[in-house]
Every structure is written in structure tokens, then in C-alpha cells.
Amino acid sequence: IRKKGLTFKVFTISLEDVEISTVKEIVNKYTDINIIANIKKVYKISGETINFLHSKNISFGGMGDLMRFSSQEDNEITIDKEFDYISRGLRQHLQVKSFERLDNRRVKIKRHDLKDVIAIMLNDYEISVESVRSSKDLYKDFQIIVKTNPNGGITSEAKVIAGTLNIEICTWGDFLGKLNTFWN
């Protein structure tokens, strides 16, 4: 319950892979929900599923997103802050023709006169071997891991493992520069 503003209904799940069929089942059964909150810290949800929820005026996110949603006074769709930051940077980049959110972490970027790139955006404080391996297991298809958290770092071991998997790894600032090159 909000201290100030409209009341809202939340549906809570705990899934690592959030399928559109599951979400449609929830939305069809509980027609008055405003947000679906996933307890799992690491999860995957497709861009198609996110778009479906937004078409129904339903927000989706983790527990932090639920807290942010509850501090609003209305039930407007909440876009996760990290993707809002990423999309603004990509929209403003002169080499980016367009981009598509494939899921909650991966973005397919179409560039002018250069090959498309699929990047996974990680907001981890430190990108470790585990970050690389778990991302590869969960998200499978991508060419580069982009560290969007300006704090912390990327371990040398993570760079080695990423290299053996033919995955590049860099910070957000370095990635924006790489978008101008033929690197992939």
C-alpha cells in the first residue's frame, strides 16, 4: 500500500526464465494487476514479453523495481532505470541506426555500414568468471559483454574466459567507441 497515491496490485513470481506463456496465463487470470515482480535476482525475460506486458499497462521487474513502483503516486509503466540509460546512449550514438531489446539484458544493435552487434549489458559491480559463464548459459547468443556499472571492474580471469568463448568484454564507455569500428 502506498502512503500517497493510487493503490496497486502486484503479482510475485520466482523464475529464472520468464516465458511469455507463463506471463499471459498470469495476465489472463489476474486482470487487475499493475506490476509483476520477480524475486529471482538473475532472470531472463524476452523483449516480446516485456512489450506484451507494456501493451497491457503492466510493469515488470525485480524487487528494486517493485520498491520504485510503489514510491510512485500513480500506476504508470515503470521502465527499468538501467535500460533507460542504455537506450538513451544508443539513441544518441551517430553510428547506431536502430536497436532492439531482445530480453532484459541483450540488445541487438544495427549500425550504419557495419555489422549488427548483439551485446549483453551487465550492471555487476565486478565482472568475474562467474558473470561470464552464467551469462553465456542463460543468454547464449551475444558477441560482447558490456559492463554498465561505472564502479568496480572486470577481472583479468573474466577477460581470459570471455576470450576463450569468443566474447569481448568492456566498459560502457569503451563500448560506445567500439561501435564506430569493424571490431566484430
List the predicted regions and their residue ranges:
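Conserved catalytic cores of phosphodiester-cleaving nucleases, focusing on short active-site segments
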Residues: 1-29, 35-40, 105-138, 144-145
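Short, aromatic/basic amphipathic alpha-helical patches
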Residues: 26, 45-56, 155-165
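Gly/Ser/Thr-rich loops at beta-strand to alpha-helix junctions
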Residues: 41-44, 151-153
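Surface-exposed beta-loop interaction hotspot
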Residues: 47-94
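A short acidic, often aromatic-flanked loop/helix-cap motif at beta-alpha or helix-coil junctions
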Residues: 66-71, 127, 175-180
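Short, solvent-exposed polar/charged micro-motifs at secondary-structure junctions
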Residues: 71-74, 108-109, 181-182
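Redox- and metal-dependent alpha/beta enzyme cores, enriched for Fe-S-associated oxidoreductases
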Residues: 87-111
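Alpha-helical oligomerization segments
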Residues: 132-184
